[in-house]
Amino acid sequence: PMAGDGQVLVNLGLIHRDNEVIPYWDGWLAWMRSQGWRRFAWYVWDQGPGMPGDWQGRFAPSFEFVFHFNRESRKPNKIVPCKHAGQESHRRAYGSSTAMRGKDGEVGGWTHKGQPTQDTRIPDSVIRVMRHKGKIGRDIDHPAVFPVALPEHILLAYSDPGDIVFEPFGGSGTTILAAQKTNRVARAIELAPSYTDVAVKRFQQNHPDIPVTLLATGQTFAEVEAERLETADADE
């Protein structure tokens, strides 16, 4: 079961049909809410420069959404370096603070009244990570590869080293690589066997010293692959 303060973040892009944006996520958002998941936040993934091409009169696409659900909130980790760390740059020339005020008009401890700027801050609601470019490895491919930096950013913000993170759409194994990089424990699912192979091979190519085995039998991936080929040859 998920921890009480577990956070669910889901990336979805735009779809156009008959010259309109299709809000295909509406039914799913309603279903999540009916299951007790709050529509906690809605972020934008800034993918960098717009994609080249003819977009039928629209601006070139350069973003996607990230929907954030939870049952209870958790403060994100401060992972973004502050440009003016250690400086009192939030003070005006005449000495008053530019820190955010509360509803009562007072500047309190949460906004660090009278303190220098911290080393790090919480991430913005716009996630600025360049889209993936190029190949993902030798003799492997996937039609929708995400940059490792995207799940890495989320994992650093909403989990701690040693935490278990769940990826229900394993794809090319991007979240698995991000978990390995950030010292999290990934649990991923992928329904397409061919993409499961891609994810495993991609992980092996990035981490050749880490053994990959089938839990049920202890076989290595190479042994399982060879067994499949033997079965396929026997069926022909």
Q: Regions from the language model: what does each represent?
A:
Residues 1-197, 236:
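Core catalytic lobe of class I
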Residues 200-236:
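S-adenosyl-L-methionine
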